[in-house]
């Protein structure tokens, strides 16, 4: 499980704009006066650190990923970096954390992996999981094949992604994470991307990536798939649903 740095850079402005303000404010309030040990899982190039570092003064960050190339870029934040196989060793990564963070990660995880991570989270620690895909998408104008294509994309999302045994939870990940952390104080808020013509490169990249995933399912014939892809590439607006979850100690 790894991502192209160019894709991460392309989505970064949309991610930054989408983060839900209430979980961030609650996290900042809880963290005030604490010198936190923060572990960011699946850190990529360090986007979560860049989003939160100013809100968590004095925190000691460890950025964790399995991809050495992404970690080399994440090191530019000045935080400690750690290369780790998250599929196998996530429990080790969070064992001494006061705060665990992740962005756009949990929809790639299996139910087993989420349960393991939740069980390993120290009782005193908090977890902030942002930008988890929730399956809701609105493209304008919409192509007639949109419902069938989106259903096929969701099926692809629920295939194995390498983060735990079995299929990824895809749009169901936040619900599973909330259930696994039900003994904590939870706040869940929507954090959708709201894309316009100004976001054309991201819209086009999404259209291409989703079309590739749908093609692997065989749900659409090639002609319909191409027409749907092109309609998405030319969309005037797109809203892509995500959820941000904050879990604070009970």
Each predicted region: which residue ranges?
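Conserved class I S-adenosyl-L-methionine
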Residues: 35-44
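A short, conserved alpha-helix within the catalytic core of class I
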Residues: 108-121
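C-terminal helical/coil "lid" or tail adjacent to the Rossmann-like core of SAM-dependent
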Residues: 189-235
């Amino acid at each position: 499980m790894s991502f192209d740095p160019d894709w991460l850079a392309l989505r970064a402005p949309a991610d930054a704009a989408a983060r839900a303000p209430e979980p961030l404010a609650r996290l900042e309030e809880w963290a005030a006066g604490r010198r936190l040990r923060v572990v960011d899982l699946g850190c990529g190039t360090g986007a979560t650190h860049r989003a939160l570092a100013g809100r968590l003064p004095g925190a000691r960050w460890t950025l964790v990923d399995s991809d050495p190339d992404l970690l080399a870029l994440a090191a530019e934040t000045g935080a400690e970096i750690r290369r780790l196989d998250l599929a196998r060793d996530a429990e080790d990564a969070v064992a001494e954390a006061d705060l665990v963070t992740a962005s756009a990660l949990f929809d790639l995880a299996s139910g087993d992996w989420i349960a393991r991570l939740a069980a390993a989270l120290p009782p005193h620690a908090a977890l902030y999981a942002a930008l988890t895909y929730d399956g809701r998408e609105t493209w304008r104008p919409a192509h007639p094949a949109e419902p069938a294509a989106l259903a096929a994309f969701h099926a692809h999302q629920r295939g194995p992604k390498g983060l735990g045994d079995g299929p990824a939870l895809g749009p169901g990940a936040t619900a599973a994470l909330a259930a696994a952390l039900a003994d904590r104080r939870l706040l869940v808020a929507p954090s959708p991307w709201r894309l316009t013509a100004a976001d054309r490169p991201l819209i086009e990249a999404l259209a291409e990536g989703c079309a590739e995933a749908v093609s692997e399912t065989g749900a659409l014939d090639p002609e319909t798939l191409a027409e749907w892809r092109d309609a998405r590439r030319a969309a005037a607006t797109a809203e892509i649903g995500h959820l941000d979850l904050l879990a604070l100690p009970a």
